[in-house]
Amino acid sequence: MDYKTQYQMYLSQASAALEDACVKFLPEESEVCRAARYSLLGGGKRIRAVLVFSVCDMLGGDPQTARAFSAAVEMLHCYSLSHDDLPCMDNDDLRRGRPSCHKAFGEATAMLAGDVLLTEAFEAIANAPACPQACVQAAKALGLGAGSRGMVYGQELDLKYEALAATEEQLRLIHRNKTGALINAAVQMGAAAAGADADQCRALEAYAYGIGLVFQIVDDVLDVTSTPEQLGKPIGSDSENGKTTFATLYGVEGAMALAQRVNEKTCSALRETFGEKSAFLEQLAQQLLTRKN
């Protein structure tokens, strides 16, 4: 199966899992849940959800086991976007080419919609048709990736260094937590669904943080080279606010050269553990490096 066909297969599985989660956990009669659905079903790359399915598949697991885990990580990701867009955080009015949740439903409802998505993500794991050990591992991975030692910590650091001249080391720390931690949660949840061993989990962790860094470097570059229409969100706010990014630190060419080096190292290490089975994940990493939105 070629890469595009395989990606579409995982994407279809992820979309079906999200539709199922909406029916189970987000009743339409609730305004807050309608706002949550708006955030959850508003498009996007679904990279984290795809990673759950693709890792599970690579390790010989059952996609039905991965289904609820995939929905859970995407629900948590969308909660974070709903909150990040709020005026008290990043203050963005556009998300995925349409008004962000707080512009469509109001700030209070957007805040509650994020709360619902966060909470129901763990209920989705608890109700997954998987063995108890896999559910515990998935919940632990998601909590670790999203909380005070992961995504939330990364957002805290991002706000802290917003008006400061951050170093490359500080930028790496910010994005290891803000972006990489939840990507790692996704691959670990896929690994849990397939019953992966410790060595496999460590190799997947290195991969997750590698592609997370590449994703952020490319994001910084696109913020100065792309358009709002291409990205589906505002651009240029980082430079307007005097925020240090990989693009401002090294320039566009230097930042992309760094991303290329990280990507090569990441894929090489993954191949050492999984051999030819890692082909899809390597191609996904390359897609994240060369993406235009």
Located regions from the model:
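Short cytosolic juxtamembrane segments of multi-pass membrane proteins
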Residues: R291-N293
